[in-house]
UniProtKB/Swiss-Prot annotation:
It catalyses: tRNA(Leu) + L-leucine + ATP = L-leucyl-tRNA(Leu) + AMP + diphosphate. Its EC number is 6.1.1.4. A motif ('KMSKS' region) lies at residues 619-623. GO terms for cellular component: cytosol. It comes from the Bacteria. ATP binds at K622. InterPro entries: aa-tRNA-synth_I_CS, aa-tRNA-synth_Ia, Leu-tRNA-ligase, Leu_tRNA-synth_edit, M/V/L/I-tRNA-synth_anticd-bd, Methionyl/Leucyl_tRNA_Synth, Rossmann-like_a/b/a_fold, tRNAsynth_Ia_anticodon-bd. It is found in: Cytoplasm. A motif ('HIGH' region) lies at residues 42-52. This is Leucine--tRNA ligase.
Amino acid sequence: MQEQYRPEEIESKVQLHWDEKRTFEVTEDESKEKYYCLSMLPYPSGRLHMGHVRNYTIGDVIARYQRMLGKNVLQPIGWDAFGLPAEGAAVKNNTAPAPWTYDNIAYMKNQLKMLGFGYDWSRELATCTPEYYRWEQKFFTELYKKGLVYKKTSAVNWCPNDQTVLANEQVIDGCCWRCDTKVERKEIPQWFIKITAYADELLNDLDKLDHWPDTVKTMQRNWIGRSEGVEITFNVNDYDNTLTVYTTRPDTFMGCTYLAVAAGHPLAQKAAENNPELAAFIDECRNTKVAEAEMATMEKKGVDTGFKAVHPLTGEEIPVWAANFVLMEYGTGAVMAVPGHDQRDYEFASKYGLNIKPVILAADGSEPDLSQQALTEKGVLFNSGEFNGLDHEAAFNAIADKLTAMGVGERKVNYRLRDWGVSRQRYWGAPIPMVTLEDGTVMPTPDDQLPVILPEDVVMDGITSPIKADPEWAKTTVNGMPALRETDTFDTFMESSWYYARYTCPQYKEGMLDSKAANYWLPVDIYIGGIEHAIMHLLYFRFFHKLMRDAGMVNSDEPAKQLLCQGMVLADAFYYVGENGERNWVSPVDAIVERDEKGRIVKAKDAAGHELVYTGMSKMSKSKNNGIDPQVMVERYGADTVRLFMMFASPADMTLEWQESGVEGANRFLKRVWKLVYEHTAKGDVAALNVDALTEDQKALRRDVHKTIAKVTDDIGRRQTFNTAIAAIMELMNKLAKAPTDGEQDRALMQEALLAVVRMLNPFTPHICFTLWQELKGEGDIDNAPWPVADEKAMVEDSTLVVVQVNGKVRAKITVPVDATEEQVRERAGQEHLVAKYLDGVTVRKVIYVPGKLLNLVVG
């Protein structure tokens, strides 16, 4: 074996071996316990970033560990290949999205291989291929036939620049997240999947997910937003229809002093016919985008419609206002306002001088002071006629019952969750498999015309989708009648909602899933990805699993047993102010820094001499130019070093601060491991270990080895605290480096220890461990080696540390056999130089002995 650790030589050799031997390819094997380890599939943006590397390293560590436990481990990878960035890049680079995407996939695949991830490449899939999306199209047509898909006109956030619909989350401060253009509201027909039909199950089954982070489950609970309340109908004077509102607080109903409707509500539209102020307000609202986060903070505005509704219980007339905080697509498009007990209603009423009527007493039983704000806490009713004196629950039920009896109220369960709009007006996505016949009939694309293939050889103008721009593309014939294909494409969350299941049978040609394979591998045992996917992807992922279950394809209720959300990767960020006052961000790689004695950055400049402002650690991003290229790091230090640093620098679910000094530290550690194995193997063959012939020191070292195995096993397997596992291995390495290597049993013990260390490090740093395992003459390839098992007998402490005091002052610490008597301990203590010195010529008056812990000799 060569003396120096040269990762660039060994890593490519080991990777070639894995490729040729197809080491990580697996098939169903009923005789073995399966383990399905999955990291969220990447978008092929062109290059891997450190966030990817962290995600996939965690996955690979878990997969390799489970494999060493003897399980049949599936770890696949693929590409979430549709999406808007490809269109932008294609326009910029004067190409089409398909070649750009496939080039990126090829490049990033090499990067993944360079990092040594143990993927089953035979299962690789790209979601932009017809072989993949054809099954999604087929499934969609089946959902349509089941009544779970429908088309309706809905108001969307429209970016006039990108010519596309934006999700609420993609609108930042009223502007498009990509191009910063002001967003408009537009009504267009769209396809929806009825996720609301599964709302209760999606909510209740969160309780089954014991190994998902509570934060994610809470976010999903809030997103689904189940509430119990009452739907109340109001008559409106001089208006043909009634108004219906939903409230979760019927106990406050006697304090309702006005109603508010959305600008798009038919009542507001009718009132605007002869009210120019209202018409202008409706126009303004139409172009204001409303994401919920902004709804809470934006200025509340409204205009009186002039209509009066009649309070069903008091008979009072109350005004109906059009307001910008009511959304047509949420609930009924109308709300009842109780300004005394709802802060938003209070602010609106105060602004426009509307009546504020308190109906709930303060906690101390007094009338509430509403001069500054609403009283939003629940309490006892007053000012409420027959309901006075009732507490919240009693009032809720009494008022709900009365409204129901009168025929103007109905108890309802409501959800915040909306149906999933899956239409996108983009080109680079899977075509939606629906057609419109000449006579206006809308129907699913017939099976014999699936897949509806997206043409890849197109010219992008950056504005109109090529399949919308080409009238010929949409033309088809169905049942002998001319028909037009849908030119919208699927939301790309569709592809990522079921890919995990297709990995179990990627070549299956008879349908979406081969149930036998799917039910062998599913559910996923651990799913690893960022918490930013908590509500969108992870909710659709769960929803799709239930849809596939109800179609008879899978037999489990949930797609993944455990979810691990890795933390973000942070790096130093620097900028200098340019001539026009703009910030120019400088890569941390190019910053020349001065640090104080605590290692903190106090001064920085770049090669051109600009004084740099240091803004601290922040998430690696293009905008701050503080991303570190993983490829550069792998070329400099080797993949094993990068992987080890990633797993050691911080717990997997916490943020990780990228520090090159830490990477260098990881590299030094691997060099030490290499050196120790080199020095050990250079001495030739090793005798068998005879555990009965070991000295006390050898037994103590062997105890450390096996205690480390036990700790690392628990840290990786149960606790998933990978950083503490690595720390324990490092600690053991320090002891091994100091251990004697002259005697036959010293070397036999070192052999046992190194074989254990190399196997424990293998999930983290597989290339160096593959090589060292061969040098240590381990059996077969380390990829098929079993995880080391701690020897219980070796861990039994046969000696213990006793503190020796003279007159209460510590004079020595001695190691004695566990079963030593007090006499033997006193005798052993007397042999210590310092103890003997303080006992010389004095009488021991009293002995205090705590067995196995303390010996205190009181002398006088």
